[in-house]
Amino acid sequence: MQNHSLLQKYDKIITESKPILEQYDLCDYCLGRFFIKKTSFLSVKKLGRKIRNSINAKDTVQCYICKDIFSFSDFYVKMMLDASDKYQFSTILVGTILKQSITERDDKIRSEFCLRGVDSIKTLVTRELEKKFTKITHGVIDHLSPDITLTINFKTEHCDVKTRHLFLYGRYTKSKRGLSQKQKSCEDCYGRGCLFCDNHGIVSFDSVEGKVSKVLYKKFQTEHVKFTWMGGEDKESLVLGNGRPFFAKLISPKKSDVLLPKKSHQDEIVIHDLRKIDHIPKGTIPFKSKITLLIETKNKITSEKLKELKHLDGIPIIVTDERGIRHKKIIHSLKYKKESARSFFVILEADGGLPIKRFVEGTSVDPSICKILDTECSCRQFDIDQILP
């Protein structure tokens, strides 16, 4: 009974195929594609050949739909292999961009002969390239989060390569003054990446960002790195203790399986605990900073007056940003030590994001050190002693 049903289905396919082949020259791939879902065949090419032989149809000179694109599949697979040669990957995704004329001819025939539920020519081309490429590379198709995505553009005869972004976590300490945290963007592309900056978005490497980027460029062969910093410091500040945490997003790296050292010395900075993570946390990450400040005053300050700084301990500090939005920061502990008649040290532990110099000078911060002491104050320097969770 089952065999009889299969024969009936096959007879119907033969009947439906005849008028199509009478009007259009189709290759075995395109012919088999129209009917494979009605059969138990696994190969569209074999089904197309069987249909052609069953009705004694002549071999096509050139396929009306695809212009024999499948005859050149080895050429395009070679293009994919060459394009992906320097990349590390185990999972892949293949995409294709066909000429509009091909998809229009495919749509025309499917509409004309009411061929519903049929895979498009784009789907079949993509699938055939996937089969051949994975057979050679032993890669696994992953439609959700592939290591590498290869897109063949049949209009330009070019293979575009993109890899999955990598995310890293690390910390840095800074032992010398005069090094900015952030690097100035390339003046030609404003940080987007261009030929002049080798798509890095930066040209120089004389900052924390630049020095960390240089390490990541070399190890992962990535072009662009985007950083998320847990707080910031002044150019003249030291970063001590266990270091300042940061997150890095690597755009389209060629290497992903990289051995990362626990500690890496890069001139004025040391990178600690660099490791891969699944993603960068969203939103603001709460943290506290232990900071030592050297403060100078316009007027002489007495030890008795400095005692008033203890009023700042534990109270909310209101910080108003450029948009007029108010933020609350807490001073969790505060100690001071007089250095001279017009200078003193403050060691405080505060919520991350407290603008230290503004907190000293009183610019859009209330209360502030200058307000408590009732004299003009300036922060000569401050160092980050520790970043705390």
Which residues fall in each region the model found?
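Non-catalytic RNA-recognition surface used by pseudouridine synthases
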Residues: 2-389
